Structure formats: structure tokens, C-alpha cells
């Protein structure tokens, strides 16, 4: 059965043949992988469906199980999400700690832009005011962290007002999309300035399946969800011997 196929309880998804000793020895490890990755893909599919029709894309995160990142990110892609960063090498993300170490948000962005790495530059905003500052600094994307839906709407409105007033920095040279390290999945890479005249907007923090639709608002391009990989329940799978001939 091809991966990504939706199944119902009781459906046989695969058949294997081999020596009984080998099959029974590998049973638990094989099921652990299948249950874990199928659970990630299943939860991801639910999030993707929750925002259908809005144009918003679901992103995974680096909050993955140690040593399983490549597999878990493949599972989120099978579920319909876009892969975010695989590591620190394929995108610059300025967060609160980076800003503190660099001497402030503006200084952190300045230092990042001074390095011609050809990587997308994303910066985290914790308030509407920080988002406004980042928009004037010319970042590719602004990550709104732990915003309420009303704060997201207010931020988009204010950024568009800044754009109309000509107060946003011009676009950086277009950032090439980078291929994912496995599975041929495209890594989400922002364009310099979105068609709306403002940096792309990503929303993260406090996002659950029950409320994600509330955050899929006009002006939002991405919603990143750590729960896809750090909180996905395992799919209930079992292996049964039915022929010993």
C-alpha cells in the first residue's frame, strides 16, 4: 500500500514473508518506526485539512526526536505539510536569545544581513511593535510568536499601512529555494517581499488542532506547528502471523 494512503481499522497495509526468527526479532523495532511515523503523518494530515481553503501552509519544525529528524520530516511531508528548516544550515532564524546576545533585535538583523549566505532570513516578533520594527529592517519573513488571532490581524494591518507609507525596506535579493535533504521535498523558503507588499507572515505558538483555523487569517502565509513531531500519538498497528507453511 503506497505511503500516504488513508486506512481504516482492520485494513492490512503490508505483507511480509521470511524466516520466523528474523521476522519475530525485527517485529518490535519495525512496528515502532511504522507507528511513530504513521502517527506523525496522520496528525499532520489533520492540521492540513483544518486550514483547507485558506491558502495558509502548514510547516513542521526542528522539534523532532533525536536521530529521527529526516524520517519525521518525511512523514510530515507525506501528511501534506511543508518542511521547515532541517538544521541551522538552511535558514537564518533570529529568536529572542539571538537578539539578546547580539545587543538587540535590530543589531541581530544587521549582523545576519551582513553575511552573504544566500539563506532566507526569518525573525521572531513577540509584540506587534517588534513586528513593525522587523518589517522596516527588510527581513524575508516575520514569525509572530504566541500572538492571539486579533493581534495577528492587527499586525498585518499595521504592516500594510507601513508599506503604503513607503516605510518598509526594499526587498533583499531573491532567496533561492533549497532542496530538502531527502525525499525530494521542497523546503519552505520565503520570497523577499510577498505580493501584499509586506514580509511573509508565519504564526507559531499556542496552535492546536481545535483553534488553528482561527489563525489562518488573511495576510498569514505559514503556520508552524511543533506538535506535528513532538506530540503525535502513535498509530495503532500490529503484526500477526497467519501462515507458517
Residue ranges of model-derived segments:
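Intrinsic disorder/low-complexity segments
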Residues: 164-198
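Active-site loop ensemble at the mouth of alpha/beta enzyme cores that anchors a bound cofactor
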Residues: 238-245
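Active-site catalytic pocket residues across diverse enzymes, especially alpha/beta-hydrolases
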Residues: 159, 163
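Extended hydrophobic secondary-structure segments
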Residues: 143-149
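Acidic/glycine-rich phosphate/pyrophosphate-binding loops and surrounding catalytic core
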Residues: 1-126, 130-137, 141, 153-158, ...
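Short secondary-structure boundary segments
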Residues: 146, 205, 227
Amino acid at each position: 500500500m503506497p505511503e500516504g494512503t488513508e486506512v481504516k481499522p482492520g485494513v492490512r497495509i503490508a505483507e511480509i514473508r521470511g524466516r520466523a526468527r528474523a521476522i519475530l526479532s525485527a517485529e518490535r523495532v519495525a512496528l515502532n518506526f511504522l507507528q511513530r511515523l504513521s502517527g506523525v503523518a496522520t496528525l499532520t494530515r489533520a492540521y492540513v485539512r483544518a486550514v483547507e481553503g485558506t491558502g495558509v501552509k502548514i510547516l513542521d519544525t526542528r522539534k523532532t526526536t533525536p536521530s529521527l529528524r529526516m524520517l519525521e520530516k518525511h512523514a510530515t511531508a507525506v501528511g501534506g505539510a511543508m518542511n521547515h528548516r532541517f538544521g541551522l544550515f538552511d535558514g537564518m532564524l533570529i529568536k529572542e536569545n539571538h537578539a539578546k546576545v547580539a545587543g538587540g533585535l535590530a543589531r541581530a538583523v544587521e549582523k545576519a544581513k551582513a553575511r552573504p549566505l544566500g539563506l532566507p532570513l526569518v525573525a521572531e516578533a513577540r509584540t506587534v511593535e517588534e513586528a513593525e520594527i522587523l518589517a522596516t529592517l527588510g527581513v524575508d519573513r516575520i514569525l509572530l510568536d504566541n500572538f492571539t488571532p486579533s493581534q495577528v490581524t492587527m499586525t498585518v494591518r499595521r504592516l500594510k499601512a507601513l508599506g503604503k507609507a513607503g516605510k518598509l525596506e526594499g526587498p533583499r535579493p531573491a532567496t533561492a529555494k533549497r532542496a530538502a535533504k531527502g525525499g525530494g521535498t521542497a523546503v519552505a523558503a520565503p520570497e523577499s517581499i510577498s505580493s501584499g507588499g509586506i514580509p511573509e507572515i508565519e504564526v507559531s505558538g499556542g496552535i492546536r488542532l481545535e483553534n488553528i483555523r482561527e489563525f489562518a487569517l488573511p495576510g498569514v502565509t505559514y503556520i508552524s506547528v511543533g506538535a506535528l513531531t513532538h506530540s503525535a500519538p502513535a498509530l495503532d498497528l500490529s503484526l500477526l502471523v497467519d501462515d507458517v507453511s
